[in-house]
Regions:
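Internal "kinase-insert"/substrate-recognition segments embedded within catalytic cores
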Residues: 103-113, 120-122, 127-128, 134, ...
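Conserved NTP-binding catalytic cores of kinases and kinase-like/nucleotidyltransferase enzymes
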Residues: 18-134, 139
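Glycan-association/targeting regions that enable binding to alpha-glucans and other polysaccharides
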Residues: 424-531
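Exposed beta-strand face motif in extracellular beta-rich ectodomains
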Residues: 67, 500-504, 562
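Bacterial Sec-dependent N-terminal signal peptides
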Residues: 1-19
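Residue-level detector of functionally pivotal "anchor" positions at catalytic/ligand-binding pockets or at interdomain
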Residues: 427-437, 529-555
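C-terminal tail/sorting-segment detector
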Residues: 563-580
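Middle-to-C-terminal accessory/interaction subdomains
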Residues: 19-23, 31-33, 37-39, 50, ...
Length: 580
């Protein structure tokens, strides 16, 4: 039996002189410090044989204190490297058991200015104490990086004083190098949003605060126990943000990159990272104020992604985590003023929901995730097997990829969490609503047109900012005037300003839902320098099919002799009939 494609409408998205901005080029390339295909060995040697007791004591009494060591990688030895222990529960739990496998903070630049390790001044080695698989943080990064600036990670073998300490997760530091890479500058205000409290507080210090962005008054010292300032100054900047959130002193979009925040919240929910602001516990994020005056939310510490050790509180009632409300925090009683503000704003709520749909559709393919995990575990299995300091067995190393288990605590499985969470989210009454469909984005001279189905409003979101932010809304019309050829034909038009370096995306809404093109906007967007006629078609065989929808926008299986919409990962849509 033969059948063929009848392509009714090929939907181009790129033009001569126009591209989709691709932020993935910012991330580490093959051979870099975070090369996922490499399992390197790092050797640390301290001159002081009593190094461990010194570092444990300073962890409690002077957490920023470092001692010198040499570090060797790939046969090259670096002198006077500053080392300290880091972490909280991941330090306390092994340390309380006299297990030497604690996390490390390594500063190459501490005593020797300009010294770097494969281009990085600082690295952080996490011990995966709550992750039997060793791959949850790495797998989470592979998803987060598609939607907002995120730290990188891979695995390394660590030797201390010549002895194999174990398999570690090498994680990128959120510092000036990170902000320079992602925001092209490094002088802005930076906060690590984690309370000063300690999981194992043997020193009797006061409990830390909660970085929930609640307004505590004008006195900035009231915020010291909840936020850790990493830049030279910035408390007044943070207070201005908190006042905007809680008191409405200035519009929130004038001081916060709202879209980045919505992306962070969306990915948190889809991958069940509940150890952060819009989850169970309010911490594990950074705030950086870039030159456009907007605070950027940066995710951090993803070892409890796919529920992770959060499962311990709900192991015998897993619906609590698998069916965690993605809009939790909209109620003032929850005490999360930022989610309360954003989730009760109709447009921001729709945009957040659209982002969750995108992450679900693009990033929860268990076959792809399992393949990447198998690759990393195959590379590191011997290193894990010979790690006598790890907290789990090799049987759990493999089995926790597929399913949760109970040991001394409960630990969420990667695939079981994805399957349960995906099923819940796709059936959620708000997420399952039908959004508009956007296709055929086209520029001819100064006229931008796009085909949109099932929309009540279509907007051009445009900016010329060098910081790729502060997109402004311009209504697109289907009224037969102002450049629109025919009214009510589903083709929306707008006249573009006659200027170069325009960055834009399309935002369409109906009464229920929202759709963006490209779907990863505002992290990705269309850009062009000169307007050069009709857009050209993309190379089809380089695209990945994301889903197939019927004429009502509902995801369906491919069928014969019916109108179908094929939606690709580059934002393009093809309307097809497969004739049998």
């Amino acid at each position: 039996m033969k059948y063929f494609w009848k392509i009714l409408c090929l939907c181009p998205i790129l033009s001569f002189g126009q591209t989709i901005y691709n932020p993935q080029s910012l991330y580490d390339s093959t051979g870099g410090i975070f090369d996922k295909d490499s399992l390197r060995s790092i050797y640390i040697n301290f001159q002081d044989a009593n190094y461990h007791n010194v570092l444990v004591n300073s962890f409690f009494t002077n957490p920023s204190y470092r001692i010198p060591s040499t570090l060797t990688l790939n046969g090259t030895t670096y002198d006077s490297v500053g080392v300290r222990y880091k972490g909280n529960s991941t330090f306390c739990l092994p340390n309380d058991d006299d297990n030497p496998k604690v996390p490390f903070n390594i500063d190459m630049n501490y005593w020797i200015s300009g010294q770097k390790l494969l281009g990085k001044k600082k690295i952080k080695l996490a011990n995966a104490w709550m992750d039997p698989t060793f791959v949850k943080e790495f797998s989470a990064f592979q998803i987060y990086k598609n939607y907002l600036p995120s730290p990188e990670a891979n695995l390394v073998k660590l030797y201390v004083q010549g002895n194999y300490q174990g398999l570690y997760v090498n994680t990128e530091s959120i510092n000036k190098q990170f902000t320079k890479k992602h925001f092209d500058e490094k002088s802005g205000t930076l906060f690590k949003c984690d309370g000063s409290g300690m999981f194992c507080d043997t020193a009797g210090t006061p409990a830390g605060g909660t970085p929930n962005l609640t307004y505590l008054g004008e006195d900035t010292t009231m915020y010291y126990s909840s936020y850790n300032l990493k830049s030279d100054n910035g408390w007044k900047d943070l207070l201005e943000l908190i006042q905007s959130i809680n008191l409405g002193t200035i519009p929130i979009d004038s001081i916060l990159n709202v879209d980045r925040t919505l992306w962070a919240f969306a990915v948190n929910q889809v991958v069940s990272n509940l150890d952060t602001y819009n989850g169970y516990y309010v911490h594990n994020y950074y705030l950086y104020q870039s030159k456009d005056n907007l605070f950027q939310m940066i995710p951090w510490d993803m070892d409890n992604t796919f529920v992770g050790a959060i499962m311990g509180t709900s192991f015998f009632n897993p619906a609590d985590v698998y069916e965690y409300d993605p809009y939790q925090g909209e109620d003032p009683a929850v005490g999360r003023p930022l989610t309360e503000l954003l989730f009760n704003h109709p447009t921001y709520r729709k945009q957040y929901t659209a982002h969750m749909r995108t992450v679900i559709n693009e990033s929860l393919d268990t076959a792809i995730i399992r393949g990447k995990i198998n690759q990393i575990q195959s590379l590191s299995s011997n290193a894990a097997d010979t790690d006598v300091n790890k907290g789990f067995t090799m049987a759990q190393y493999y089995s926790n990829v597929e399913s949760a288990f109970w040991s001394w605590w409960g630990f969420g499985g990667i695939m079981s969490t994805i399957n349960e969470r995906k099923q819940y989210l796709l059936s959620h009454p708000e997420i399952s609503l039908n959004p508009p469909l956007i296709s055929n984005v086209n520029i001819n001279n100064t006229l931008l047109t796009t085909s949109v189905f099932n929309a009540t409003m279509v907007e051009l979101m445009l900016t010329t900012s060098q910081y790729n932010s502060k997109f402004q809304s311009f209504i697109m019309n289907d009224d037969g005037i102002n450049g629109d050829i025919m009214s009510n034909d589903g083709i929306y038009s707008v006249i573009l300003p006659s200027t170069n370096n325009i960055k834009f995306y399309i935002r369409s809404q109906n009464n229920d839902a929202m759709m963006l093109s490209p779907e990863r906007a505002e992290y990705e967007f269309y850009q062009y320098s000169t307007i050069s006629g009709v857009l050209e078609s993309p190379v089809i065989d380089k695209r990945k099919l994301v889903k197939v929808c019927d004429i009502l926008g509902k995801e369906v299986n491919i069928d014969f002799n019916t109108t179908l919409f094929f939606i690709y990962d580059d934002g393009s849509v093809e309307k097809r009939i497969i004739v049998k």
